[in-house]
Amino acid sequence: YLIYDIEDNIMHKNPHSPGTNSIVNYLRGSGKILYLIKQADHVITSSPVLNNYCITVNQKKSCIYISSSVDTDNFIPSNNYNNDKKVVIGWTGTFSSKEYLDNLRDVLVKLNRICDFKLRVIGDFDYELPGVDLEVIRWTRENEVKDLQGIDIGIYPLIEDEWVSGKSGLKAIQYMAFGLPTVATNVGNTPSIIEHMENGWLVKSNEDWMYALDRLIKTPALRKKLGISARKKVLENYSKHVIQDQYLLILNRLE
């Protein structure tokens, strides 16, 4: 049996990533991907949009959306949700997603004039943001948990395009696993993960970002409410223990 598990949005090229070399392009050739989708006995996708696309290609119409998952035994909250120290707003990502963070530069500079906070950027690149208390941390697997546990508010800015429409929303799930109140752009798969003002905060405009971050910085009780609910949703829906059962159902069906 051939089971094809697709994590990335293979429908579209990421317009924000740097160019790759010819070998990588060959290995990722769209023709090979389409062939595998078509021939697979079952296709597993990481977003509803991606799943709908694969159904039109797979000859057996045997496709299912299974969300990205996190290790909730390792991704453990450590936040006490108080303001006894400067609140840390955190973002994590790679250089290819840096543009999304860049879109918040003006918001963060303006926010710093009315709120006392630190911005923690965890990634694989250097970053500068004059006018903001900034901490840049190089991402490592060994320190990932510790670095994310040091955040009070997770931010997940995106833009509305075809690439984002097929993304899984894993970054939001990661923040939520740590019990972090997460502010995210209301596009793509994010609204199916974050329920506005129940376990996170969905925004559209720069004004929305300003208001949400200002409220969360100044209201520890709201951070706690959203953060605890976020952790609960991840445990019930996105934990590796929950997701592995969905994979087992598919494997057993193919026997």
Q: Where would I find each of the regions flagged by the language model?
A:
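Active-site proximal beta-strand in glycosyltransferases
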Residues: 1-14
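Membrane-proximal helix-turn-helix segments that form the acceptor-binding/catalytic region
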Residues: 10, 23-43
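Donor nucleotide-sugar binding/catalytic pocket of nucleotide-sugar-dependent glycosyltransferases
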Residues: 38-77
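Short, polar loop motifs at secondary-structure junctions
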Residues: 48-51, 121-128, 186-189
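Conserved catalytic-core segment of nucleotide-activated headgroup transferases in glycan assembly
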Residues: 69-77, 82-150
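Nucleotide-sugar-dependent
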Residues: 99, 142-177, 184-192
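Conserved acidic donor-binding segment of nucleotide-sugar-dependent glycosyltransferases
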Residues: 196-207, 215-221
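A short, well-ordered alpha-helix in the C-terminal region of glycosyltransferases
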Residues: 215, 222-237, 243-249
